[in-house]
Amino acid sequence: MAGKENNFPPLPHFLPLKPCFYQDFSDEIPVEHQVLVKRIYRLWMFYCTTLGVNLVACLAWWIAGGAGANFGLAMLWLVLFTPCSYVCWFRPAYKAFRADSSFNFMAFFFIFGAQFVLTVIQAIGFSGWGACGWLATIGFFGTSVGAAVVMLIPAIMFSLSAVVMAITIVKVHRIYRGAGGSLQKAQTEWSAGTWRNPPSREAQFNSFSGNSLPEYPTVPSYSTSGSQWP
């Protein structure tokens, strides 16, 4: 955003890379939605942590006799979904609440819904998906109890992520419908191109109100020289 230096992700100063986004909940998100947006952010962090724990569990699975492909896929999920989930569903949610953007709400519902389905699949734990879910964990207890106990941790974390994602979708949808959001508004934003970087609500208000009145209204003055009452 103009006049604001990007601050996320926070990177060490010695790296040649610079932060890609500006993120400040107290500055950009309306007070009534700050708690919810922060919870969505924490959900993203929890899901990324789950992917990291899943990678360790898949390594234990592999060492105990499981397929090495699961470890490879777990590494791919961690590297791929950590940045993509932030860009593809957290940022739309952030921009949606920042500017009451119907297009970003729609993008959030679509992508976050797909993320929810994927997380449910990861929690179930189908063989060959690179996720230590319930089926993979329970089935491996007969082979290695120690590895299965490690695998149980991401199974629980994937399940918690899926539950919180479902609750989040319901809460965000209620707010969206209550604020009068619609597909027509999303199409209008798409046509105008404002979906890319919608202005904050404060900026929209300032643009709408403008300088309609001078800071100090002037009172008309009338010359009294030569004027007499009859």
UniProtKB/Swiss-Prot annotation:
Keyword field contains rRNA processing: no
InterPro entries in alphabetical order: SCAMP (IPR007273)
TM helices/strands, residue ranges: 40-60, 61-81, 106-126, 149-169
Stretches in topological domain Cytoplasmic: 1-39, 170-230
Phosphothreonine found at: 194
GO biological process, one term: reproductive behavior
Region (Disordered): 197-230
Name of the protein in its database record: Secretory carrier-associated membrane protein 4
Compositionally biased spans, kind Polar residues: 203-212, 220-230
Pfam annotation, one family: SCAMP
Homology family: Belongs to the SCAMP family.
Compartment(s): Membrane
GO CC annotations, alphabetized: recycling endosome membrane; trans-Golgi network membrane
Organism field: Rattus norvegicus
Gene this protein is translated from: Scamp4
KW Transport (keyword) present: yes
General function of this protein: Probably involved in membrane protein trafficking.
UniProt keyword terms in alphabetical order: Membrane, Phosphoprotein, Protein transport, Transmembrane, Transmembrane helix, Transport
Membrane topology: Multi-pass membrane protein
